[in-house]
């Protein structure tokens, strides 16, 4: 058994303008090559576009989109007796949010469009409405977990 002790879980910081942790998580995931100011620009432009499109509070749209995409259950590959099984496991809230943000950004990067802010805002609005690639990814993950329910006892 390790003598080091467990690492303290860091609390997510808030972003400077909206004072929102989800926005900061989004910024840290969209970040490429250490260009954080560019990541903030993209997010804030996307939030403005959401405001123009929906005429609702953009942070509530963001929250709704992330809540809609967050998976409850996922599958994890586990090797048992020479064969690999996809074992369904429950996902915690923090890990679920991280997965949701990753899926939203991946889906928005694949979208055709002018710039990342436009694509991200479109994907977030679609996810809040219950459609889009990120929602499809969540449903696919849930289907995989349901199909492999027989292997749940390998957990």
UniProtKB/Swiss-Prot annotation:
GO terms for cellular component: chloroplast; small ribosomal subunit. The lineage of its organism: Eukaryota, Viridiplantae, Streptophyta, Embryophyta, Tracheophyta. CDD domains: uS7_Chloroplast (cd14871). One of the primary rRNA binding proteins, it binds directly to 16S rRNA where it nucleates assembly of the head domain of the 30S subunit. GO terms for biological process: translation. It is found in: Plastid, Chloroplast. It holds the Pfam family Ribosomal_S7. One of its GO terms (molecular function) is structural constituent of ribosome. Belongs to the universal ribosomal protein uS7 family. It comes from Schisandra chinensis (Chinese magnolia vine). This is Small ribosomal subunit protein uS7c. The gene is rps7. Part of the 30S ribosomal subunit. Keywords: Chloroplast, Plastid, Ribonucleoprotein, Ribosomal protein, RNA-binding, rRNA-binding.
């Amino acid at each position: 058994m390790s003598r080091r002790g467990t690492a303290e879980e860091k609390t997510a910081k808030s972003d400077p303008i909206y004072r929102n942790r989800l926005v900061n998580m989004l910024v840290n995931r969209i970040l490429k090559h250490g260009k954080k100011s560019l990541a903030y620009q993209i997010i804030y432009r996307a939030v403005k576009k959401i405001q123009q499109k929906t005429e609702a509070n953009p942070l509530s749209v963001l929250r709704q989109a992330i809540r809609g995409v967050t998976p409850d259950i996922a599958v994890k590959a586990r090797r048992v007796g020479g064969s690999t099984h996809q074992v369904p496991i429950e996902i915690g809230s923090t890990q679920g949010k991280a997965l949701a943000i990753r899926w939203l950004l991946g889906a928005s990067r694949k979208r055709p469009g002018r710039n990342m802010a436009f694509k991200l805002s479109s994907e977030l609005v679609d996810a809040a409405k219950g459609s889009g690639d990120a929602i499809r990814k969540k449903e696919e993950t849930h289907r995989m977990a349901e199909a492999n329910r027989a292997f749940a006892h390998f957990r």
